[in-house]
């Protein structure tokens, strides 16, 4: 089936069209055409903050999966709600725990997807890198999260959150989680 997609970017915002009809939500574009564009500005990915690296991987995954988009959105809402609960003068620990239990569920999904995506991307990059470089360097990247990535991720998360809970109450915010993850790039 032939699709016609158009994106017009002006100095104020993006305008999205599908078959000449305006599209209100970016998520309506997801999964129609899979493409990753790389330009010189993207080199900042290696030198900028972890937030920008997370944003890069999230944007690419959102292009590939509406499920990822909704899961990430759920996490962001839960994180905001948990942080609001931690900011109360009289913290409702039961409510904070309810948010945490839900956060653990969605984080396990996001961690797996981010890690799988990065591994897949790096496999392709290792395959193509020799065509762009005369050097015999080996490149790599690792997804750095706050827990080991294994079948027991959820129990590791629970333990990690239990260890920092008193500190979170003092700082009135969630101190660990996927919102603090990073990508470690390696050369040789």
Question: What kind of feature is each model-predicted range?
Answer:
Residues 26, 50, 54, 79, ...:
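Alpha-helix initiation and N-capping motif
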Residues 32-36, 48, 76-86, 184-186:
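Noncatalytic linker/hinge segments flanking ATPase motor cores
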Residues 44, 72-76, 176-181:
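Low-complexity, flexible helical/coil segments
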Residues 45, 52-53, 63-64, 75, ...:
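Residue-level detector of solvent-exposed, low-hydrophobicity positions
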Residues 57, 64-114:
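Long, non-coiled-coil amphipathic alpha-helical linker/lever segments
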Residues 91-188:
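Conserved NTPase motor "head" modules and their coupling/switch loops across ABC/AAA+ ATPases, GTPases
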């Amino acid at each position: 089936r032939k699709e016609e997609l158009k994106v017009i970017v002006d100095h104020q915002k993006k305008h999205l069209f599908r078959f000449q009809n305006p599209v209100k939500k970016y998520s309506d574009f997801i999964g129609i055409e899979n493409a990753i564009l790389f330009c010189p500005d993207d080199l900042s990915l290696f030198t900028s903050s972890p937030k920008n690296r997370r944003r890069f991987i999230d944007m690419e995954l959102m292009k590939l999966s509406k499920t990822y988009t909704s899961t990430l959105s759920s996490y962001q809402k839960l994180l905001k709600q948990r942080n609001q609960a931690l900011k109360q003068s009289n913290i409702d620990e039961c409510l904070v725990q309810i948010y945490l239990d839900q956060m653990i569920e969605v984080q396990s999904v996001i961690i797996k997807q981010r890690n799988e995506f990065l591994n897949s991307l790096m496999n392709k990059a290792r395959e193509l890198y020799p065509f762009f470089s005369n050097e015999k360097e080996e490149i790599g990247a690792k997804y750095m999260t706050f827990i080991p990535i294994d079948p027991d991720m959820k129990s590791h998360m629970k333990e990690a959150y239990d260890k920092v809970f008193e500190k979170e109450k003092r700082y009135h915010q969630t101190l660990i989680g996927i919102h603090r993850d990073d990508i470690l790039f390696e050369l040789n």
